[in-house]
Protein backbone atom coordinates (compact mmCIF):
# COMPACT_ATOMS: atom_id res chain seq x y z
CA UNK A 1 0.00 0.00 0.00
CA UNK A 2 1.35 3.42 -0.95
CA UNK A 3 1.23 5.88 1.91
CA UNK A 4 0.15 9.39 1.17
CA UNK A 5 1.90 12.25 2.84
CA UNK A 6 -0.89 14.74 3.21
CA UNK A 7 -0.31 17.46 5.77
CA UNK A 8 -3.14 19.84 6.61
CA UNK A 9 -2.51 23.13 8.39
CA UNK A 10 -5.38 24.51 10.43
CA UNK A 11 -5.59 27.44 12.81
CA UNK A 12 -6.90 30.97 13.21
CA UNK A 13 -6.31 33.89 10.88
CA UNK A 14 -2.78 35.15 11.28
CA UNK A 15 -1.38 31.84 12.54
CA UNK A 16 0.90 31.60 9.51
CA UNK A 17 -0.70 28.67 7.71
CA UNK A 18 0.21 29.91 4.22
CA UNK A 19 3.69 31.14 5.11
CA UNK A 20 4.60 28.02 7.07
CA UNK A 21 2.88 25.76 4.55
CA UNK A 22 4.98 27.06 1.66
CA UNK A 23 8.22 26.50 3.57
CA UNK A 24 7.13 23.10 4.89
CA UNK A 25 6.20 21.94 1.39
CA UNK A 26 9.53 23.18 0.05
CA UNK A 27 11.47 21.36 2.77
CA UNK A 28 9.50 18.12 2.29
CA UNK A 29 9.43 18.41 -1.52
CA UNK A 30 5.63 18.29 -1.58
CA UNK A 31 3.11 20.42 -3.44
CA UNK A 32 1.72 23.38 -1.50
CA UNK A 33 -1.94 24.32 -1.90
CA UNK A 34 -3.80 27.17 -0.21
CA UNK A 35 -7.54 26.43 -0.24
CA UNK A 36 -8.42 30.14 -0.24
CA UNK A 37 -6.30 30.68 -3.37
CA UNK A 38 -8.02 27.75 -5.10
CA UNK A 39 -11.46 29.13 -4.21
CA UNK A 40 -10.57 32.57 -5.60
CA UNK A 41 -9.11 31.10 -8.77
CA UNK A 42 -12.08 28.81 -9.32
CA UNK A 43 -14.65 31.56 -8.70
CA UNK A 44 -12.73 34.32 -10.45
CA UNK A 45 -13.36 36.71 -7.55
CA UNK A 46 -11.83 37.35 -4.15
CA UNK A 47 -13.12 35.89 -0.90
CA UNK A 48 -14.49 39.24 0.29
CA UNK A 49 -16.73 39.36 -2.77
CA UNK A 50 -17.99 35.81 -2.12
CA UNK A 51 -18.76 36.72 1.51
CA UNK A 52 -20.54 39.90 0.42
CA UNK A 53 -22.67 38.10 -2.16
CA UNK A 54 -23.27 34.69 -0.56
CA UNK A 55 -22.52 35.26 3.11
CA UNK A 56 -20.37 33.04 5.29
CA UNK A 57 -22.63 30.04 4.73
CA UNK A 58 -22.22 30.25 0.95
CA UNK A 59 -18.47 30.63 1.30
CA UNK A 60 -18.21 27.64 3.67
CA UNK A 61 -20.12 25.50 1.17
CA UNK A 62 -17.67 26.47 -1.58
CA UNK A 63 -14.76 25.86 0.79
CA UNK A 64 -16.01 22.36 1.66
CA UNK A 65 -16.45 21.49 -2.03
CA UNK A 66 -13.00 22.80 -2.97
CA UNK A 67 -11.26 20.93 -0.15
CA UNK A 68 -13.10 17.72 -1.11
CA UNK A 69 -12.02 18.19 -4.75
CA UNK A 70 -8.41 18.84 -3.77
CA UNK A 71 -8.31 15.70 -1.62
CA UNK A 72 -9.94 13.61 -4.36
CA UNK A 73 -7.44 14.78 -6.98
CA UNK A 74 -4.18 15.31 -5.09
CA UNK A 75 -1.87 13.31 -2.84
CA UNK A 76 1.34 14.18 -1.04
CA UNK A 77 0.41 17.79 -0.40
CA UNK A 78 0.68 20.46 2.23
CA UNK A 79 -2.74 22.14 2.39
CA UNK A 80 -3.29 25.44 4.17
CA UNK A 81 -6.97 25.77 5.01
CA UNK A 82 -8.97 28.87 5.79
CA UNK A 83 -9.34 29.66 9.49
CA UNK A 84 -13.00 28.65 9.48
CA UNK A 85 -12.74 25.50 7.35
CA UNK A 86 -13.10 23.38 10.48
CA UNK A 87 -16.58 24.77 11.14
CA UNK A 88 -17.97 22.28 8.62
CA UNK A 89 -18.26 18.73 10.06
CA UNK A 90 -17.69 17.15 6.63
CA UNK A 91 -14.48 19.13 6.15
CA UNK A 92 -13.26 18.13 9.62
CA UNK A 93 -13.92 14.49 8.79
CA UNK A 94 -12.15 14.73 5.44
CA UNK A 95 -9.07 16.34 6.94
CA UNK A 96 -8.75 13.99 9.88
CA UNK A 97 -9.17 10.88 7.71
CA UNK A 98 -6.87 11.83 4.82
CA UNK A 99 -3.65 12.96 6.45
CA UNK A 100 -1.97 14.55 9.44
CA UNK A 101 -3.61 17.66 10.84
CA UNK A 102 -1.32 20.32 12.30
CA UNK A 103 -2.98 23.01 14.41
CA UNK A 104 -0.93 26.20 14.31
CA UNK A 105 -1.83 27.94 17.53
CA UNK A 106 -1.62 31.74 17.71
CA UNK A 107 -2.47 34.15 20.49
CA UNK A 108 -4.99 36.94 19.99
CA UNK A 109 -2.07 39.40 20.21
CA UNK A 110 -0.27 37.60 17.40
CA UNK A 111 -3.39 37.55 15.27
CA UNK A 112 -3.92 41.28 15.82
CA UNK A 113 -0.33 42.04 14.89
CA UNK A 114 -0.33 39.83 11.80
CA UNK A 115 -3.72 40.98 10.46
CA UNK A 116 -3.53 44.69 11.31
CA UNK A 117 -3.15 45.83 7.70
CA UNK A 118 -4.81 42.86 6.02
CA UNK A 119 -7.96 43.65 4.05
CA UNK A 120 -8.47 40.15 2.61
CA UNK A 121 -10.20 38.70 5.67
CA UNK A 122 -13.95 39.25 5.46
CA UNK A 123 -14.73 38.62 9.12
CA UNK A 124 -12.11 41.19 10.16
CA UNK A 125 -13.43 44.16 8.18
CA UNK A 126 -14.19 46.02 11.41
CA UNK A 127 -12.46 48.81 13.34
CA UNK A 128 -11.91 46.80 16.53
CA UNK A 129 -10.71 43.33 15.58
CA UNK A 130 -10.04 42.07 19.12
CA UNK A 131 -13.64 41.15 20.07
CA UNK A 132 -14.12 39.42 16.73
CA UNK A 133 -10.90 37.42 17.11
CA UNK A 134 -11.82 36.49 20.68
CA UNK A 135 -15.26 35.28 19.58
CA UNK A 136 -13.81 33.30 16.67
CA UNK A 137 -11.22 31.70 18.96
CA UNK A 138 -13.84 30.71 21.54
CA UNK A 139 -15.94 29.12 18.81
CA UNK A 140 -13.16 27.44 16.83
CA UNK A 141 -10.48 26.44 19.35
CA UNK A 142 -12.28 23.25 20.48
CA UNK A 143 -12.79 22.26 16.83
CA UNK A 144 -9.13 22.82 15.96
CA UNK A 145 -8.08 20.67 18.90
CA UNK A 146 -10.64 17.96 18.15
CA UNK A 147 -8.99 17.02 14.84
CA UNK A 148 -5.38 18.04 15.45
CA UNK A 149 -2.72 15.34 15.41
CA UNK A 150 -0.29 17.89 16.81
CA UNK A 151 -0.54 21.44 18.16
CA UNK A 152 2.34 23.79 17.33
CA UNK A 153 2.58 27.10 19.19
CA UNK A 154 3.67 29.84 16.81
CA UNK A 155 4.11 32.63 19.37
CA UNK A 156 7.64 34.02 19.15
CA UNK A 157 8.89 31.18 16.94
CA UNK A 158 10.53 31.63 13.56
CA UNK A 159 9.08 30.04 10.44
CA UNK A 160 12.13 27.76 10.26
CA UNK A 161 11.65 26.66 13.88
CA UNK A 162 7.97 25.90 13.32
CA UNK A 163 8.70 23.97 10.10
CA UNK A 164 11.34 21.94 11.96
CA UNK A 165 8.88 21.13 14.78
CA UNK A 166 6.32 19.91 12.27
CA UNK A 167 8.93 17.87 10.37
CA UNK A 168 10.10 16.25 13.61
CA UNK A 169 6.52 15.30 14.46
CA UNK A 170 6.00 13.83 10.98
CA UNK A 171 9.18 11.74 11.27
CA UNK A 172 8.06 10.48 14.69
CA UNK A 173 4.67 9.59 13.22
CA UNK A 174 6.51 7.78 10.38
CA UNK A 175 4.70 9.75 7.71
CA UNK A 176 8.10 10.84 6.34
Curated annotation (Swiss-Prot):
Family of the protein in this entry: Belongs to the shikimate kinase family.
Pathway: Metabolic intermediate biosynthesis; chorismate biosynthesis; chorismate from D-erythrose 4-phosphate and phosphoenolpyruvate: step 5/7
InterPro entries per UniProt: AAA+_ATPase, P-loop_NTPase, Shikimate/glucono_kinase, Shikimate_kinase/TSH1, Shikimate_kinase_CS
Named cofactor requirement(s): Mg(2+)
SUPFAM superfamilies reported for this sequence: P-loop containing nucleoside triphosphate hydrolases
Quaternary state and interactors: Monomer.
Catalytic activity: shikimate + ATP = 3-phosphoshikimate + ADP + H(+)
Domain of life: Bacteria
Residues that bind Mg(2+): 18
Protein's organism: Francisella tularensis subsp. tularensis (strain SCHU S4 / Schu 4)
Designated name of the protein: Shikimate kinase
The entry's keywords: Amino-acid biosynthesis, Aromatic amino acid biosynthesis, ATP-binding, Cytoplasm, Kinase, Magnesium, Metal-binding, Nucleotide-binding, Transferase
Gene: aroK
Protein function: Catalyzes the specific phosphorylation of the 3-hydroxyl group of shikimic acid using ATP as a cosubstrate.
GO biological process entries: amino acid biosynthetic process; aromatic amino acid family biosynthetic process; chorismate biosynthetic process
Presence of the UniProt keyword Cell membrane in the record: no
Amino acid sequence: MIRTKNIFLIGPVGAGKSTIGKQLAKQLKLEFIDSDDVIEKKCGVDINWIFDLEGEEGFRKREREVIAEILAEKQNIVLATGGGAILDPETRSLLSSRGKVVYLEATIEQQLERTSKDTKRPLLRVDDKRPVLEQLMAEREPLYRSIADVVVETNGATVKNIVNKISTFLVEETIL
